[in-house]
Regions:
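Hydrophobic transmembrane alpha-helices and immediately adjacent juxtamembrane helices
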Residues: 1-260
Length: 260
């Protein structure tokens, strides 16, 4: 019964999103064009770096291209639904619309994570997938290698998703959080496309444990070239989920409405 309810909720949200996409389909093609321009500029930057040095923070030119593809995939997946939905939920804490979700008998976290769906960022996912597949084929293929990367990528995205829910829970308790999500998304867009080891150690710690950009992008991309990353990602994912669930339960118990 619960699974059927989830499917009905997802179908209703998907239907509304598809209707919105059709009404603003020109925006999708513009997003694809802009994503292509951004990707071209990033590849040009990587070519410039590769022409000056063969290795950057331990990453070869091929590895940097693969990292860029992973960055596009993660950024697109997060911005399709989770990022705009959690931002909208935190806004709803102030205007009262979040109470409708919290009073709903359905799965709250599911509704929060899919309340807003934007199809424009799918262009990032498509372009990123194209880059990673091309790099995989150029590296000689290998289904086991690809499967290892896909699992690592899923764990990395799951860790970042749990972090978004953690911020949403903290937003309920402190009546803040929107600015944190916006800043984190900017970090994801700008810093995530470069190797984590390129930064100073204090910033590496921040990008791993405070805003898990490294765990979502650099570590999964590195797992394509080196094995042994899945254990780290599995532990980080489990820890992030437990922390997010604990924070969310505390937030729900302490929340008394938008007028507080």
């Amino acid at each position: 019964m619960r699974i059927r309810y989830l499917i009905r909720c997802f179908s209703a949200l998907l239907k509304m999103s598809v209707t919105r996409l059709w009404a603003y389909r020109t925006d999708f093609w513009m997003s694809l064009l802009l994503s292509g321009i951004t990707l071209s500029a990033d590849l040009l930057g990587l070519w410039f770096v590769a022409s000056r040095t063969s290795v950057l923070a331990g990453w070869s030119a091929q590895g940097l291209v693969f990292l860029l593809g992973t960055h596009f995939i993660v950024l697109g997946v997060i911005e399709v639904a989770l990022y705009p939905s959690t931002v909208r939920f935190i806004e709803g804490i102030h205007d009262g619309s979040a109470d409708l979700i919290l009073l709903n008998p359905g799965p709250r976290l599911f509704l929060i994570g899919l309340s807003e769906v934007a199809f424009g960022p799918l262009t990032h996912v498509l372009l990123g997938a194209g880059i990673t597949i091309a790099t995989w084929l150029n590296a000689g293929g290998g289904l086991l290698r690809l499967a290892h990367y896909v699992v690592a990528l899923a764990l990395g995205i799951g860790t970042l998703a749990a972090w978004c829910y953690l911020i949403a829970g903290l937003g309920m308790m402190m009546r803040r959080g929107k600015g944190v999500l916006i800043v984190a998304n900017q970090i994801l867009e700008t810093v995530g496309r470069w190797p984590l080891g390129l930064h100073a150690l204090p910033l590496q710690i921040v990008l791993t444990f405070v805003v898990p950009v490294g765990l979502a992008i650099t570590v999964p991309a590195n797992s394509f070239f080196e094995s042994g990353q899945l254990a780290l990602l599995a532990v980080s994912f489990a820890g992030s989920v437990l922390l997010a669930i604990g924070t969310w339960r505390m937030a729900v118990r302490s929340y008394i409405g938008a007028q507080s």
